[in-house]
Amino acid sequence: MTKRSLPPAPAAAQGVTIVLASGRPTAGITPLAKELGLDKKGGCILAYNGGKIVDCATGEALYQKQLAPEFVPQLCKFAAAQDVAILTYDDRGIVCERDGDEWARKECVTTKLEMYHVDDLASYVDYPICKMLITVDPARRDAVCEAGKAQFEGRIDLYPSSPFFIEAVPLGVAKDVSLGALLDRMGLTRENLMACGDGLNDRSMIEFAGVGVAMQNAEDAVKQVADYVTAADNNHDGVAEAIEKFILQ
């Protein structure tokens, strides 16, 4: 998002609720929510690709789905067999056995959170988590993801969210599902929803929304389900373009 996209006051003044929907953990989205003033004006954080929704003003968890504990060691074993890194999050930031891994470090850049080394991630995680993240060389992403889907089919969901990330989340967790739950809570329907995005993990909510907007830099699979593709990308006012076209007119 850019400075032109950041001030949501005109949209908020029209009764629009801003929801920041991301694969990031809650702590990785909170700084942007505060920059937007959502902690004062109201709004929501949708974290972990839909695993959790938090009210920015109250801190209340409005919706939450967690990975069953037995999947943590299973996913760690799978990652080791594939020779890739896997990580999750605690109150401090990111936790990972391969804290120096090139692809794992990209999650630090994405979330602006610190990474902490643990000797045995499966033993360390003795608390509820919403997701684990497999990080992988882009050349191997699809093969690793397909292997994971085959191993965990019908038990948890695995899907790519970037060229080097594979999300591991509870079965059925996705941005469209959690947004649907939030809309129900608010007494609204998907026709009242505009969703903007560029990543593969945005595809479901863009297809679900009454107005689905893909950024110019979005992957083709995302553009295919969008109602509108912006002229600008997400780093050059693409979100602002959508807000001005569909909300502020």
Predicted regions and their residues:
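Short, hinge-like loop/turn segments at secondary-structure boundaries
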Residues: 35-39, 63-64, 103-107, 175-176, ...
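Short, structured coil segments at secondary-structure junctions
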Residues: 36, 41, 49, 152-154, ...
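Mg2+-dependent phosphoryl-transfer enzymes with acidic/Ser/Thr/Gly-rich catalytic loops
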Residues: 1, 167-249
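Active-site phosphate-binding/coordination module
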Residues: 6-103
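Conserved acidic, metal-coordinating active-site core of Asp-based
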Residues: 78, 82-196, 202-204
